[in-house]
């Protein structure tokens, strides 16, 4: 089977956690690697990156724009991207087209219609998440979903949102959860845990890093033996401005000895940090899944979250983490303080994390996707 994966606005197979690169990039990279074991897979992007061919896997960048261009400005290159695809890729030869994010969905819709190919769509994010409700984007997403043969969702939360807001036929939807790369995210039990907290994600307002800083400012009143590393680089048009706002808040709150910003890091370095940490603080407002929470659990790290959607399908309070609508809460302080000071309690929760993370495997994710393709190809 020949499979075309379209990731128009951001290039997989590179570092994640800065600009527009995040969970989508990891998702496309991991499923493409797995699918290429038994199929021919071509991944195309418009973002500048180094193309390569590795056995059955081809990654092709059409080099139309830089990584740091805002996603809004990337939209204007759509037609040029489609034209160049027609010129440089034998699109008729593919058995199935799988698009990731709404901009890729617009490209895939045209290709699938022109060559009568089955179209699979994975949103990774939804326009209804955005402040002010981006009607143009939501209207495009509705058109893409109507045109797609199958829409894959990453969580029950995402599935429910799409059904309620996009008027999609339930029979076109397939729930396939993302996985965890256990070749990377496997803990070294010989390493000693330290009083380290992590906040991992692109620096943008919807990721909620300011909420984490306010929690740390409050928590230090009851426990001051900790440090929190923020892993991720600025993303979006206001990312740099938001980062400066975060740093100023840290300075104004006298938290410089408790907080350090590390920019984005390779997954292997994130793994090494997780291996020493006792807590991941997750304050992202909107997630279709919450990959970093599953990866943290795979490293034995509990997750403190304010996300009341998809992340609660991963995290269960007092089992492998803790959910609270607000982090400024005495119960939250008690939970975190016990993780730091009660080794038996941390060990118990760590084992729960490891056990629950076994549900997530890229091998299983790719297998389910491959079965889906074969139903239509």
Q: Which positions does each model-derived feature cover?
A:
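Aromatic "clamp/platform" in nucleotide-sugar-dependent glycosyltransferases that forms part
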Residues: 285
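Nucleotide-activated donor-binding/catalytic signature segment of Leloir-type glycosyltransferases, i.e.
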Residues: 243-265
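Conserved donor-binding/catalytic core segment of Leloir-type glycosyltransferases
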Residues: 2, 191-207, 213-216, 228-231
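Short alpha-helical donor nucleotide-sugar binding micro-motif in glycosyltransferases
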Residues: 264, 272-277
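N-terminal subdomain of nucleotide-sugar transferases
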Residues: 1-53
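Conserved acidic donor-binding segment of nucleotide-sugar-dependent glycosyltransferases
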Residues: 317-318, 322-330, 338-343
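Carbohydrate-associated surface elements
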Residues: 157, 179
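Short hydrophobic beta-strand element within catalytic cores of glycosyltransferases
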Residues: 302-305
